């Protein structure tokens, strides 16, 4: 199982031509994003309360699920 943070996973999604790619790009451009965080609740709280990320939270939920699957391989 991989030991990468959500941020590291998001970097692999940058460049996709969909809303998940848009979210990954916004995460990359957010200099305050918690780059070493893995916890869903911590990341979700940050996006909802502290960031200017404009992608719907449902996209974050979907991308986080993809992250969990990605960690398995």
Curated annotation (Swiss-Prot):
Q: Which residues form a coiled coil?
A: none
Q: Which SUPFAM superfamilies match?
A: YozE-like (SSF140652)
Q: Which InterPro entries match?
A: UPF0346, YozE_SAM-like, YozE_SAM-like_sf
Family named by the database record:
Belongs to the UPF0346 family.
Q: What is this protein called?
A: UPF0346 protein SH1485
Organism per entry: Staphylococcus haemolyticus (strain JCSC1435)
